[in-house]
């Protein structure tokens, strides 16, 4: 196993590159949010209400939304269906969650999303159509969903860079070789 499994391939198919780019962003985001207590996860910068805890919960929602409703039309499930109160609910409500809950929510959503996206790729490939449509009923392709996830992570991994630096000074583009997120005492992924 590679010491840097999040690195995209140097030469590979379009699908391998898209999945590699997504996993690199996921890993970098998770590294930026890793190993913090409640205070660290709720740190804000200036007038912004963004926190690493809010980003963990928001990106868990995005992973579940993309890999259920948009991918297959399957209901998104809990906790997203019954707790939704307002547009920024995932960001705001994260203040009520423990670090363990936030990490488990994100880790679980990513694992589910990977499995669902892998199944869709095995079934129809990158050119397969998904449930999501435009206003005229035109169906989106799986490639679009992967690009949407990459865009979302690109935006929020940049936010996470700034937030984490404000918490404890951690900077850098990639986790150190061999890094794995910890849940309790066991590595994840």
Predicted regions: what they are:
Residues 88-129, 141-154:
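Acidic/histidine-rich alpha-helical segments that form the ligand environment
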Residues 4-8, 15-88, 130-189:
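Short, contiguous alpha-helical
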């Amino acid at each position: 196993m590679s010491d840097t499994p999040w690195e995209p391939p140097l030469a590979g198919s379009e699908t391998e590159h898209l999945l590699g780019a997504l996993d690199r962003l996921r890993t970098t985001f998770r590294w930026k949010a890793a190993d913090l207590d409640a205070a660290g996860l709720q740190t804000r910068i200036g007038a912004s209400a963004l926190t690493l805890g809010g980003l963990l919960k928001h990106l868990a929602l995005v992973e579940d939304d993309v890999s259920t409703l948009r991918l297959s039309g399957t209901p998104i499930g809990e906790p997203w269906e019954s707790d939704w109160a307002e547009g920024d609910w995932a960001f705001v409500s994260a203040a009520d969650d423990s670090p363990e809950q936030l990490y488990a929510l994100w880790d679980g959503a990513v694992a589910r999303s990977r499995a669902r996206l892998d199944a869709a790729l095995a079934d129809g490939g990158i050119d397969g159509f998904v449930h999501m449509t435009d206003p005229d009923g035109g169906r989106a392709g799986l490639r679009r969903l992967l690009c949407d996830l990459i865009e979302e992570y690109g935006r929020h991994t940049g936010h996470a860079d700034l937030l984490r630096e404000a918490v404890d000074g951690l900077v850098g583009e990639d986790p150190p070789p061999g890094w794995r997120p910890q849940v309790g005492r066991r590595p994840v992924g």
